[in-house]
């Protein structure tokens, strides 16, 4: 049973779905992605991986397949997290989803699924945290961050080794330039973003008494392609405060700030929900979702010059937030 979206599934009689394997054939919006809105394109596609199995099981399906959430290329299926459901669920490459859809249009298709994925027992992991102490207000904190874990298929170079390196290099650039911001710059490599964001939750729990002193949180978790600027969950007043920073970022074309209604990145989401201004580096995303969550997420996908641009982008914003006279208005 092939459907393109949830509305098509819900429009079907239950008896037509019962006992079938449902394929969600939602096509990733390549044109939206190459226009600088790769994250939005991914968000439209990934809901079927995240929630498709639950929706199909409620209609009596015995299994689900989802067209991989990302740009189709090289017949690579993309892995990722899915909501718990009482039926098997798997991802297929974009090319194979198209093949199944074409065959289904011609008649009955029989599929045999052999799924070997499993979730092992929980183990102990750790966030990695380092502080560059503020010169005047060390109790006030600006976070720069990426996440340490990755899916098992690739090496995690773009998701999110690049983000960790960019955050580390932010502190290193300030040290090398002998800059001493007024507030503490805190570098965090978050643990377990991919499965449940438990590193984020542990940090907020451990620092619950200090959340009010968090001036801002930045994360890089969209690879290391050319930065366009930032997606930001901040007030309009805070956006005006950042106008001088945008002037500096314009030097290498990274001066856009797009306000968003919710946290731009997973690991800083809880802080954002508690009122901490949250920013995520906005890259052009031309190829990120081609390799994301696949065996092709390897170091050769990183362009050194673009990685340096991302480090400069985070360093400029991180230093500005840590050193400005008044913190961002919440």
For every predicted segment, state its role.
Residues 2-14, 79-157, 169-182, 205:
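Soluble metallo-hydrolase cores and metallopeptidase-like ectodomains found primarily
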Residues 2, 21-25, 62-67, 89-91, ...:
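Structural recognition of the beta-strand scaffold that forms the well-ordered cores
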Residues 57-62, 66-69, 101-105, 172-179, ...:
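Sec-exported extracytoplasmic/periplasmic mature domains
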Residues 89, 172, 176, 183-186, ...:
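His/Asp/Glu-rich mid-to-C-terminal helical/loop segments that flank catalytic regions of hydrolases
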Residues 1-88, 155, 256-257:
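Extracellular/luminal Protease-associated
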Residues 17-22, 59-64, 108-109, 138-142, ...:
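Loop/turn elements at helix/coil->beta-strand transitions in domains of secreted/extracellular proteins
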Residues 87, 97-98, 104, 137-139, ...:
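Metal-dependent peptidase/peptidase-like ectodomains
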């Amino acid at each position: 049973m092939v459907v393109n979206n949830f509305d098509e599934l819900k429009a079907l009689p239950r008896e037509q779905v019962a006992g079938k394997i449902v394929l969600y054939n939602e096509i990733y919006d390549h044109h939206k992605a190459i226009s600088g809105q790769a994250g939005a394109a991914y968000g439209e596609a990934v809901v079927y991986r995240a929630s498709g199995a639950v929706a199909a099981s409620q209609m009596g399906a015995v299994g689900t397949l989802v067209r991989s959430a990302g740009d189709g290329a090289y017949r690579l299926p993309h892995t990722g997290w899915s909501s718990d459901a009482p039926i098997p669920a798997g991802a297929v490459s974009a090319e194979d989803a198209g093949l199944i859809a074409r065959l289904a249009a011609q008649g009955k298709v029989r599929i045999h699924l052999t799924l070997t994925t499993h979730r092992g027992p929980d183990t102990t992991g750790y966030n990695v945290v380092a502080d560059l102490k503020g010169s005047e207000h060390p109790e006030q904190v600006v976070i720069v961050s990426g996440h340490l874990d990755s899916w098992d298929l690739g090496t995690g170079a773009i998701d999110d080794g690049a983000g960790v390196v960019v955050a580390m290099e932010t502190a290193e650039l300030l040290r090398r330039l002998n800059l001493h911001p007024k507030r503490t710059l805190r570098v965090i490599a978050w643990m377990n973003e991919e499965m449940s964001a438990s590193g984020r939750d542990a940090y907020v729990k451990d620092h619950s008494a200090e959340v009010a002193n968090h001036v801002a949180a930045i994360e890089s978790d969209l690879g290391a392609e050319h930065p366009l600027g930032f997606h930001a969950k901040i007030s309009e007043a805070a956006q005006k405060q950042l106008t001088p920073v945008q002037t500096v970022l314009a030097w290498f074309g990274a001066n856009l700030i797009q306000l968003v209604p919710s946290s731009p990145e997973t690991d800083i989401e809880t802080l954002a929900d508690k009122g901490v201004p949250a920013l995520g580096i906005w890259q052009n995303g031309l190829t990120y979702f081609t390799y994301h969550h696949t065996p092709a997420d390897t170091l050769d996908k990183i362009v050194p010059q673009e990685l340096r641009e991302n480090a400069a982008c985070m360093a400029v914003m991180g230093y500005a937030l840590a050193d400005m006279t008044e913190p961002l208005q919440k």
